[in-house]
Every structure is written in structure tokens, then in C-alpha cells.
Amino acid sequence: MLKNYINMVNIHNFLLYQRFDILYLKKIKLISLLVFTSLIFISTANAKYASFVINENTKRIYHNTNADTRNYPASLTKIMTLYMIFDALKYKKVSMNTKFKISKRATRQPPSKLNLTAGSKITVKNAIFALITKSANDVATVVAENLGKSERNFAKLMTKKAKKLGMTRTIFKNASGLPNRGQLSTARDMATLGMAIRKNHPNFFKLFKTKSFVYKGIKYTNHNNLLGSYSGTDGIKTGYTNASGFNLVASVERNGQRIIGVVFGGKKARSRDKHMIKLLNKYFKTVPSKPLVRIAKPSELPKNRPKLTVVEKNIKNFSIPPKVVNISSSNSLQDDWFI
């Protein structure tokens, strides 16, 4: 009897230690997993930031930080969606007055959106301005479904077009830029896309400087704060999701020279804009200016010249005031979860 009891105690202790060992191993595995996950998160967080500045005229690269690192483009995706619309217009597959049907799926997209009604229609023209200004996700889906039959198929067409344009590290999974782990691009690729639109669709590129758009009595303002506040800015687009941070592709032309700047992973819209301005200011200094017309000295003018007008008398005292940069401090997303 005693021997059996001792055996039972030994078996119990053995099982207890075994259970402890299993729990201990599970704990170690859990800690290891958490550490590994943290390292991945840190790596991903650090990889968010990227920037790229290029002179479109000379193709000279002025700045490159993580320009080929894949990041989430967010609503910069809509630049390609717009490129696809411009292609369709160019090849007369649609016109500005063509009406796109609105599906239930499109209306279910999260903000930023126009709050479209299923079963109704929206013109190509309104779709373009809604994408440029409001960055409407529901409109992006409408465009995809009408031009590509389905958003999934449209995304494949977008990726194919990207490769054709030289965007070698870009993959699209949707037309809006809404969160998708497989939707990736780079700062360099987005600069390539911006230049491609201006080269292949110059008249449509001008639409990117639209500051506001009215649809059904509601005014929507462009998210690109550099428009009207930073001299020479004429496009192109912002993007934001929690995973991507605040992104921006900017186009600025001065003295006949155009610079394209790209920033990925800004912490705030305001700090992203300030950083972009800092990059552009720095590299505009290296851009050669067009020669200015020299004003002749009075001794060089003809003796029998007519008397100077009031305007001519004041030319020598004329100076251009410096451009004051005043970026809007409003960064509230409100109902705009993904812009």
C-alpha cells in the first residue's frame, strides 16, 4: 500500500513538473513572439519615412532618403486612379460628361467620401474633382468598377500601368489607397508617376491645382496646403492612413524649372508640409535661374528719348516682396479617416 502511495506521489510530481515545464516553455515562446513582433513593428515604423526630390527638367536627383523603400501610399494611390481616367479620356473611352453608376459597395467605403447614393450616377468630371480635392474613397471605387468592371481587376490594370511607366516597386490592390498590406509603393515611384502625368496628360495635370470643389451644394477643400501658400506650387496630392503616416507629392515650378518632391510617413500634416517646404527651399537654391533683363542706365538711353512716366521713374526702387509661407494649422481629420 505504502509503495503504491509513493508511486502515485512520484507520478503526481512528475506530471506537475511536466506541466510547469510546458507552461514555462509557452511563456518563453510568448515572450519571444512579443519581442519579435516588437522588432518588426519598430522596423516598420522606422521604414515609414522616405523622401525624394528631383528636378523634372534635368532629372537631377537633389535628395534621396529611403526613396526605394516600399511604404503604404495611402491616397497617393488616387494619383494613379486619376491617371487611368485621363487615359480613358485621351483615348475617348469616356468623356467628361459620361456618367458612372454608383454601386452599394462603393457607398460602403469609409471616409473620406462624398456620401454617394447607391443606384445614382456621377459624371467623370465630378469624379475627377472629387478625387483631387476631397480624396473621396467612394468615388475611387466607382471609377474602378466602371473602368475596370471590378475594383480588383482595376487594381491589376493600375499595377500594369505602373510597371509600364517605370514604377518598378509599386503594387496596387485597390483604387483608393485604403489599408491593404499588399498595396505598396516608394517615394521614387510616386515622383515618377507625378512626372508621367504632366508629360502624358499636361492639360489634365493642371487640374491638380484646384483648391476647392462644390458638389450638391457642399464645398470640398483640397487637402494640399501648399497650394496658394508656397510660391509656384501647382499640385499634386496628399495621402494618409494610420499605417502610412502623412504623405505628400508636390510639384513646384519657378524660373522655368520644375521640382517634384515626395514625402512619406509624416507625423502630422503640418510637420509634413513644413518638411516638404524645407526640402524644396534647400534644393531650389541649386536650380539655375533664367537670366534677368538688365535695365539700362540713364546714360545709356537715347538723348531724344521721351520723358519717363511715373511707372518708369519708380522702376529702380521696385522690389518684389518675399513670399510669406502660411500653412493652415487645421489638421483635424474629423470624418476623414483615410485621406
What is the predicted function of each stretch?
Residues A45-R188, M195-K199:
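Active-site-adjacent loops and short helices of periplasmic peptidoglycan-processing enzymes
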Residues M167-I171, P179-L184, R188-I339:
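Domain-terminus/edge residues, biased toward the C-terminal soluble/receptor-binding domains
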Residues L23, V35-L39, A45, T58, ...:
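Short secondary-structure boundary micro-motifs
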Residues Y24-K26, S75, A269-R272:
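Short alpha-helical segments used as structural interaction elements across diverse proteins
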Residues S32, L39, A45, K92-V94, ...:
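A generic structural signal for short, solvent-exposed coil/turn residues
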Residues M1-A50, I54-N57, Y62, S95, ...:
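N-terminal secretory targeting signals
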Residues K26, S43, N64-T65, K90-S95, ...:
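Solvent-exposed, well-ordered amphipathic alpha-helical segments
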